[in-house]
Amino acid sequence: ARAAFYPKYYNCLMKKVLLVTRVSGFIPQHEMKHVRILQDMGYEVHYASDFNNVVYGKDNHRLDGTGVIRHQIDFVKSPFSRQVKKSYLQLVKLLMEEEFAMIHCHMPMSGVVGRLAAQKVYRQTGRHVPVLYTAHGLHFYTGAPLRNWLYYPVEYFLARYTDRLIVINHEDYDRVQSFPVRGCVVYVPGVGVPLPEETAPNARVMRKTTPKMLLSVGGLSARKNHQLMIEAMALLRDLDLRYVICGTGDKQKMLQQRILELGLEHRVFLAGYQENISEWLARADCFVLPSYQEGLPVAVMEAMAAGLPVIASDIRGVNDLIEHTKGGYLVQGFDPEDYAVKIRRMFTEKDAESAVPRDVRRNLMGEWNKKRVKQFSTQVVDQQMRALYQEVLQEDNAGRRRR
């Protein structure tokens, strides 16, 4: 009744939190469980993003009916763009109009703009809003190009405006220990992956179908480095293999052209964006990730949960998940020949390191991954995020009472 007769009064009393991402689709793709946690705690969830730039998914329809209130902010990727100021002013305006109890930022540029905007509002109004920032893989990492390290002083400076700096892999956690974080650094094992129901232990051993299928899931971008695997497939023509990539991106034409140049159009397939990834995982025999850079890759966790062995780059985040020779093979460097060697080892009858038949070996690796990925499950992550949100919001409520 109060909401009907006094809408403005009711709106002021409603507890609100704001989620911020540079591109649209990230929240419905990875964070809806956390949205529901906040809603269950009695908070109205608002989402600030560039809804004209949908990267995760095909459109914004997944937010329909969720109760999430959307705010268009014209974020840009480049920190040198003139549009950065526009997005900053838009976000400051939103924070001045709405009294949020907490702000949770994801992605580098939205994390920068979000924390600066919150600090601006504090200076103008004296109203402190706790800010969380999840770094889904810091830009500066071991082996990163020099230009990536330009983000280091930026993140170091912004740490003073960060009440919780959330990192998702151990390399990042160790690196930010010296940062002057206003609150504290928290390790959370990614966004979580749902665990499927247990299947028969020998389910994959019984699969005798040929050809065998290698699967990659991820955007067709330079960072994902799918071209390396295409080159590796050219070295494996004697094996009855098929390689499928699920995803879209700006490198699609280049990759398709390379497939044709190498005569691999009947062995390598670009499947485009797929919503039914679980079905592709069920058909695959091995998951491959040749990325240059990752935070804590969801695609690898999904493959592990599906009981697949994994061949992947030995990089930050990936080596948090995969144990070499137990859950698959980690490849040092980015030479197609090295990947071809590991794939050949995975799919040949026997190798110098093991007398175990190939199908049994792959199955044992998959079972190892299914057990290991439990520590990265949505249940584990959701429990940790619920406790974290409660802690931050209780601190904010206590601060408001003192003021």
Residue spans for each PLM region:
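Conserved acidic donor-binding segment of nucleotide-sugar-dependent glycosyltransferases
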Residues: 324-325, 329-336, 345-351
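Aromatic "clamp/platform" in nucleotide-sugar-dependent glycosyltransferases that forms part
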Residues: 273, 292
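Short hydrophobic beta-strand element within catalytic cores of glycosyltransferases
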Residues: 309-312
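A conserved mid-protein helix/loop that constitutes part of the nucleotide-sugar donor-binding site
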Residues: 28-36, 212-235, 250-256, 337
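N-terminal strand-loop element at the rim of the active site
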Residues: 18-83, 172-179, 185-187
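Donor nucleotide-sugar binding/catalytic pocket of nucleotide-sugar-dependent glycosyltransferases
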Residues: 156-200
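A short, well-ordered alpha-helix in the C-terminal region of glycosyltransferases
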Residues: 338, 355-375, 384-387
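Short His-centered aromatic/hydrophobic patch
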Residues: 105-111
